[in-house]
Structures are given as structure tokens and as C-alpha cells.
Amino acid sequence: GRFFSAVMFSGSHRQSLRELQQENADIAAIDCVTYALLQRHQPQALAGLVAIGWSPAAPGLPLITAGATPAATLNSLREALQQLVSDDRYRSLCDALLICGYSDMSREAYAPLLAWRDEAAALGVSQL
């Protein structure tokens, strides 16, 4: 490739971290939630590794349902998710999963991701 001699797909973030620790890889992209959960619960999984950079803040991964889901069901799902993050009964669960809120997002909220992709392509990073 243009930037690395080889690209490998480990199959999981945890395996990518192992590959780094075993010096089978030079760099890996690990999502911030996985990284934070490992820092909190299994710091040994990050032993000997250093974060060399962070991507800009972006909306989280979308929650997806079937396109044919009725509007009433969508509303019920959204209400349930909002209750989950608002109800004290679920606070410890949300804290454990690093969930601090829920909000409906439009497709436009994800536009910065496409802009970053386009910016990278303009700099010559369209694929590794």
C-alpha cells in the first residue's frame, strides 16, 4: 500500500491490540468505547500500547431497524431508549456501558464523516 507495507484484518479490536502487543502490526484503529472499557475493566489488554492520536468527535454508530418498521414502533423504540438513559433504575447499567444519553439524529448529523472521507481522499488516503 501507499502508507503501509501490508494491511491485515484481525477480525476484532481485541485481536488488533494483541497483534500490536505481539509486534505483528504497527498501528490499529480502535474505537473509543472499546478503548475506554478496556482501560476501565481490563487495562492489561492495553499494556505496552500508546494512543498516538484521536479522531475528531463524531456521532455514535446509528441504531438501525428495518425500513418497513411502522412509525408507531419507531416512536416506541425512541421512547424506550430515552427512558433507558433518563431513568435512575438504569443508571448503573448505562454507566457500565458508557452510555450517557440518547438523541434522535438526522442523516445530516453524519455529514462531517463524509467530509473527513473526502478530505482524506484529497490528501491521497482513499484506501490503504
Question: Model-predicted segments: where are they?
Answer:
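A ligand-binding cleft/hinge motif common to bilobed small-molecule-binding domains
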Residues: 19-21, 26-46
